[in-house]
Amino acid sequence: MGQKTHPYGFRVGVIKTWSSKWYEDGAAYQKWLHQDIRIKRAIKQYLYNANIAGVEIERAANRAKVIVFTARPGMVIGKGGKGIETLKSGNVGTASKGETLFPGVSSFTDNEVFIDVQEVRKAETNAQLVAENIATQLERRIAFRRAMKKAVSTAMKFGAKGIRVRCAGRLGGSEMSRVETYREGRVPLHTLRADIEFGLAEARTKVGIIGVKVWMFKGEVLQRKARRIQ
């Protein structure tokens, strides 16, 4: 019987590269792994409105480089680079009224932290950003069919080779949960050289949580060099 496989993990080492780049043994491996998970989760929560497509972490010696991929680099960098400094060192004790508190990436690791912000130029064809956009619309009580169809048509218009969108939950406030799927173009999940992006988001509505999944096909990668987030 076939099993579901994560499209990204299925292609790691073939056409995709790891989102954490470092090597350690024993207890240090566990320590760094948990640090990476906490750092990525904290950044996603703190910069929720900045359209974060992904976070990569590179470690060498006593340094940790955190690469943030975003469709809104200006919001992350901030005025005069203040946002970068807040990401690195936090704003606890210095935050202004109404500002979200963030402990800083440095509080999660003993390494010296460097922040690098990379712009995602086409948010319309980034699977994670598309999934979060649909989830946001569902939370605003926009009809799920309208949100899904618009995301599919926009992605194809901006150059995607294929897209599949799946929403599951109490769609439209119905009594029973169900699954709705929209698809356009090719989405070859079994082809290893196919550049498939996968995005997952949750819409927290009054009737419950609605899960949103997006698969985006961007074409076939013929060269051997692994690709990172785009």
From Swiss-Prot:
GO terms for molecular function: mRNA binding; rRNA binding; structural constituent of ribosome. PROSITE patterns: KH_TYPE_2 (PS50823), RIBOSOMAL_S3 (PS00548). Transmembrane segments: none annotated. Keywords: Ribonucleoprotein, Ribosomal protein, RNA-binding, rRNA-binding. GO terms for biological process: translation. Residues 39-121 form the KH type-2 domain. InterPro entries: KH_dom-like_a/b, KH_dom_type_2, KH_sf_prok-type, Ribosomal_S3_C_sf, Ribosomal_uS3_bac-typ, Ribosomal_uS3_C, Ribosomal_uS3_CS. One of its GO terms (cellular component) is cytosolic small ribosomal subunit. It holds the Pfam family KH_2. It comes from the Bacteria. PANTHER family: 30S/40S RIBOSOMAL PROTEIN S3 (PTHR11760), SMALL RIBOSOMAL SUBUNIT PROTEIN US3C (PTHR11760:SF19). Belongs to the universal ribosomal protein uS3 family. Part of the 30S ribosomal subunit. Forms a tight complex with proteins S10 and S14. Binds the lower part of the 30S subunit head. Binds mRNA in the 70S ribosome, positioning it for translation. This is Small ribosomal subunit protein uS3. It comes from Sorangium cellulosum (strain So ce56) (Polyangium cellulosum (strain So ce56)).
